[in-house]
């Protein structure tokens, strides 16, 4: 088995007293599977890519939020103008008396739900705090580490306030149409999605929404939905015993032959080949 790449805190933190830092990825390039000896929060600002976390693929774009534990293994592939920030931290160095474990999924172990989403309002507020955090964590002045940790605590609580699961934007949310569209797409894994109906409900221009979506994500709406469905199919092929025809239905493809064509085009192998190759990892 090939040696697992591991990123070390000595290469990312200025001293052994520093608990928090910000690692920009402008843009994020393809990055091989790796682990760390620190933890991180990942926030995607724009573009798209394939993020594989603990063998589960996610098609990521603006608003995706991940909580990564040190022992988690992940990689980035098929990136397209993918811009994100990693807020990296060492749990054992945090000194503030906050309920870190309650606020950060998987804080003390590789458990809990790692994938969430942020709407435009949450992203704007997070970006502001991260900017301050990045400034403080790069300072060599008294109390810089303490200030950075205070800002990290503020960020963690802010994310708790604004995050939501990928397919369930709160009904009282005042988020933008783009946020609501991405949530609706995530909830359409098994069922058909009609953009014209969505636009009628939202009283918006289909043409303008298509343009906004492509500008922010680097994909068309159909491309995004197709790739989200393929990612879900990859996961089911590896981690379930469902028949390929049943997986096709679970992922919103009414015809299993068409599913095989799309899956092969997106991944370079047939569903059965994918299942055989990846079942050897379990």
UniProtKB/Swiss-Prot annotation:
It comes from the Bacteria. One of its GO terms (biological process) is positive regulation of DNA-templated transcription. SMART domains: HTH_ARAC. GO terms for molecular function: DNA-binding transcription factor activity; sequence-specific DNA binding. The keyword Nuclease does not apply. One of its GO terms (cellular component) is cytoplasm. Pfam families: AraC_binding, HTH_18. Residues 179-277 form the HTH araC/xylS-type domain. The record marks 246 as: Interaction with sigma-70. InterPro entries: AraC-bd (IPR003313), Homeodomain-like_sf (IPR009057), HTH_AraC (IPR018060), HTH_AraC-typ_CS (IPR018062), RhaR_RhaS-like_N (IPR047220), RmlC-like_jellyroll (IPR014710), RmlC_Cupin_sf (IPR011051), Tscrpt_act_RhaR (IPR023699). It is found in: Cytoplasm. PROSITE patterns: HTH_ARAC_FAMILY_1 (PS00041), HTH_ARAC_FAMILY_2 (PS01124). Residues 196-217, 244-267 bind DNA. Its main location: cytoplasm. The keyword Transcription regulation applies. Keywords: Activator, Cytoplasm, DNA-binding, Repeat, Rhamnose metabolism, Transcription, Transcription regulation. PANTHER family: ARAC-FAMILY TRANSCRIPTIONAL REGULATOR, HTH-TYPE TRANSCRIPTIONAL ACTIVATOR RHAR. NCBIfam families: PRK13500.1, PRK13501.1, PRK13502.1. Activates expression of the rhaSR operon in response to L-rhamnose. Binds DNA as a dimer. This is HTH-type transcriptional activator RhaR. It comes from Escherichia coli O157:H7. The lineage of its organism: Bacteria, Pseudomonadati, Pseudomonadota, Gammaproteobacteria, Enterobacterales.
């Amino acid at each position: 088995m090939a040696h697992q790449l591991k990123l070390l805190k000595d290469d990312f933190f200025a001293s052994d007293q520093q608990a928090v830092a910000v690692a920009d990825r402008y843009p994020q390039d393809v990055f091989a599977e790796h682990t760390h000896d620190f933890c991180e929060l990942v926030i995607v600002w724009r573009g798209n890519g394939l993020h594989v976390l603990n063998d589960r693929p996610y098609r990521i774009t603006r608003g995706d939020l991940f909580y990564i534990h040190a022992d988690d293994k992940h990689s980035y592939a098929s990136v397209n103008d993918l811009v994100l920030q990693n807020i990296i931290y060492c749990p054992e160095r945090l000194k503030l008396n906050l309920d870190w474990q309650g606020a950060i999924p998987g804080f003390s172990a590789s458990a809990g739900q790692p994938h969430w989403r942020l709407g435009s309002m949450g992203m704007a507020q997070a970006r502001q705090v991260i900017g301050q955090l990045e400034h403080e964590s790069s300072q060599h002045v008294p109390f810089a580490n303490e200030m950075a940790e205070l800002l990290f605590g503020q960020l963690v609580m802010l994310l708790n306030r604004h995050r939501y699961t990928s397919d369930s934007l709160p009904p009282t949310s005042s988020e933008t149409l783009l946020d609501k569209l991405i949530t609706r797409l995530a909830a359409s894994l098994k069922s058909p999605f009609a953009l014209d109906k969505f636009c009628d409900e939202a009283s918006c221009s289909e043409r303008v929404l298509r343009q906004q979506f492509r500008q922010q994500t680097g994909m068309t709406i159909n491309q995004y939905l197709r790739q989200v469905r393929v990612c879900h199919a990859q996961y089911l092929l590896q981690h379930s015993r469902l028949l390929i025809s049943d997986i096709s239905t679970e992922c919103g493809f009414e015809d299993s032959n068409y599913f095989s064509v799309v899956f092969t085009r997106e991944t370079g192998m047939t569903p059965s080949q994918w299942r055989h190759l990846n079942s050897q990892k379990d």
